[in-house]
């Protein structure tokens, strides 16, 4: 099979898998619905108010969010692996998700303690600030160390420090804050609303579009900084954009679904193996499709395995051997 045919075949397989999982997620759950009932609800011809509400207000926004956030997390992992030239770099390993988790935890505890409501925009801003702070520490360490293995250790250490501070914050939180924070910190796509979908789409889609625009400079950067400069890439500006985009994508995922590990590390490697190519122009779309399908599958298993009881995403991913947060 030629490389072009392999790419087309791989994209078709990923798109078909994503479409199948999306469809199954709409009619499979604690309340079983037939495909006919799902189609009727989606086209506005549903007669049963209960089934229409389950589809349009619960399962559909949840599935859309799983697609958006799965694509964002996988793309963030690939951007970080490209930037650090390290195959195990990812939002969790580099401490970005832990920094975002700490910032969101602080906002949730402080706001709930004073009886204030936390909007999606506030959580995203807090998560982005925490992610950028953690990334700043990693970049500061990168200037002082030469070996990538030491840099990864620095990222892991920052992650553990952020997790320790998060636990310290929780120790002084009110009971209601602890419950909300615990449920969120396990990682889940439950409780998503159309308002969440709109906010996430406003963040994720432009960030992914910007990442696609950087595909050509990324290909040059993979050949080394010297080569990238020789072909006209502003490495400093490019690096800043890469850091901002990866942090923003990881922060958005953490703000809405909590800290989710493994996806940002594993999916880019699986996609590259499937496509037989490491070119960013080909890998980025594959990462988005693969990450979306992977998160849909995990969410489907989490809410269906022991229905009506629902598992967290982390409960499933922690069974996989991968670098992860505490």
Q: Where do the PLM segments sit?
A:
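Alpha-helical transmembrane segments in inner-membrane proteins
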Residues: 1-326
């Amino acid at each position: 099979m030629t490389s072009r045919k392999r790419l087309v075949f791989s994209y078709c397989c990923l798109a078909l898998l994503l479409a199948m999982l999306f469809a199954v997620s709409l009619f499979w759950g604690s309340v079983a619905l037939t495909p006919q009932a799902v189609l009727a609800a989606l086209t506005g011809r549903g007669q049963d108010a209960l089934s229409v509400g389950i589809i349009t207000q619960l399962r559909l926004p949840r599935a859309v969010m799983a697609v958006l956030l799965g694509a964002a997390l996988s793309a963030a992992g690939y951007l970080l692996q490209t930037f650090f030239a390290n195959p195990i770099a990812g939002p969790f390993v580099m401490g970005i998700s832990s920094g975002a988790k700490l910032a969101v935890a602080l906002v949730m505890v402080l706001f709930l303690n004073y009886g204030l409501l936390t909007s999606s925009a506030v959580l995203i801003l807090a998560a982005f600030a925490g992610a950028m702070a953690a990334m700043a520490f990693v970049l500061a360490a990168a200037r002082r160390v030469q070996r990538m293995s030491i840099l990864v250790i620095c990222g892991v250490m920052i992650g553990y420090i952020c997790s320790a501070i998060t636990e310290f914050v929780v120790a002084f939180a009110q009971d209601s804050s602890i419950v909300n924070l615990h449920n969120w910190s396990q990682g889940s796509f439950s409780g998503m609303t159309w308002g969440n979908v709109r906010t996430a789409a406003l963040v994720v889609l432009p960030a992914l579009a910007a990442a696609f625009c950087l595909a050509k400079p990324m290909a040059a950067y993979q050949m080394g900084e010297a080569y990238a400069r020789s072909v006209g890439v502003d490495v400093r500006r490019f690096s800043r954009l890469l850091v901002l985009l990866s942090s923003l994508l990881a922060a958005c995922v953490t703000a809405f679904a909590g800290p989710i590990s493994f996806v940002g590390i594993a999916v880019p490697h699986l996609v590259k193996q499937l496509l037989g190519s490491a070119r960013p122009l080909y890998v980025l779309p594959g990462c988005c499709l693969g990450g979306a399908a992977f998160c849909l599958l995990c969410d489907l298993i989490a809410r269906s395995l022991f229905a009506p009881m629902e598992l967290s995403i982390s409960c499933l991913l922690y069974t996989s051997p991968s670098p992860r947060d505490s």
